[in-house]
A protein has these predicted regions:
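The alpha/beta-hydrolase serine catalytic core
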Residues: 9, 14, 109, 118-236
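N-terminal cap/lid segment of alpha/beta-hydrolase-fold proteins
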Residues: 1-24
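Short beta-strand element of the alpha/beta-hydrolase
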Residues: 26-34
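Catalytic nucleophile-loop/oxyanion-hole region of alpha/beta-hydrolase
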Residues: 40-41, 65-96
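The serine-hydrolase catalytic nucleophile loop
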Residues: 36-49, 207-208
């Protein structure tokens, strides 16, 4: 296991963990976490990573900029798309030109929009593939909403075990979260995509957005309703 630092074209450093099993294949898995999370995805990526390495895959899990141990950034799609391309490029430079992306929620959206040439398939958990409606008054405090209105930015406490104390968002973050365009997300994606949703996604509308977008996905793509394997569910 190696702790690595990758420089993005705009000069922001992103921090990650790269692990190559002794009996690894020539393919690697790159993880893409959601907004306001980190490379561990509350333990989900750690559990999946161990299972994938037992199967012979090298893994790269990294913190997007503005998250975890990576450099500071206001959290919107554009810089995170650049981060993902930089991470995929780093993996390719290590000899892993065949990559599988495992993406979660908005991390899946970012990875699809990045669409680097080395990613040959996507496995997406609860991806956001269309617009969603939020009541921001229930999501943010009065102080945060006032900061957004007056200053254009606000902070959100990071309550994970990360070294980061808070995330920084702006009005663009809210627009990115609520105004996802399936056409924009899937434009240019030409490799098969496996999508998994659970019952909670059906309640929140994520499943409906995926069903709406599914005709835009490449041939061979699959949508599956699933629950996490018992071992992963316990650890997650």
């Amino acid at each position: 296991m190696s702790q690595i630092t990758i420089q993005t074209p705009r000069g922001v450093s992103i921090s990650g963990t790269f692990t190559r099993p002794v009996d690894s294949h020539d393919a690697a898995v790159i993880f893409s976490h959601t907004f306001l999370s980190d490379r561990h995805a509350s333990g989900m990526f750690d559990s999946l990573g161990r299972a994938l390495r037992r199967a012979g895959y090298a893994t790269l899990a990294f913190d997007f900029s503005g998250h975890g141990e990576s450099g500071d950034e206001i959290i919107t799609f554009d810089p995170l798309i650049e981060d993902f391309r930089a991470a995929s490029g780093w993996l390719a430079d290590q000899g892993f030109a065949r990559q599988i992306c495992v993406g979660h929620e908005f991390g899946a959206t970012v990875a699809l929009r990045a669409n680097p040439p080395s990613v040959q398939t996507y496995v997406l958990v609860s991806p956001v593939l269309g617009p969603l409606s939020y009541d921001w008054d229930l999501v943010f405090s009065d102080v945060q909403l006032s900061d957004l209105e007056r200053h254009g930015t606000t902070t959100v406490p990071d309550d994970t075990e990360s070294v980061r104390r808070h995330f920084t968002i702006n009005k663009g973050t809210l627009a990115d979260m609520s105004m996802v365009s399936s056409e924009k997300v899937l434009r240019g994606v030409s490799v098969p995509v496996l999508i998994t949703h659970d019952a909670f996604d059906e309640e929140t509308g994520l499943l409906d957005r995926t069903r709406d977008a599914f005709p835009l996905l490449p041939d061979g793509s699959v949508l599956d309703m699933t629950a996490p394997p018992v071992g992963i569910a316990v650890e997650y």
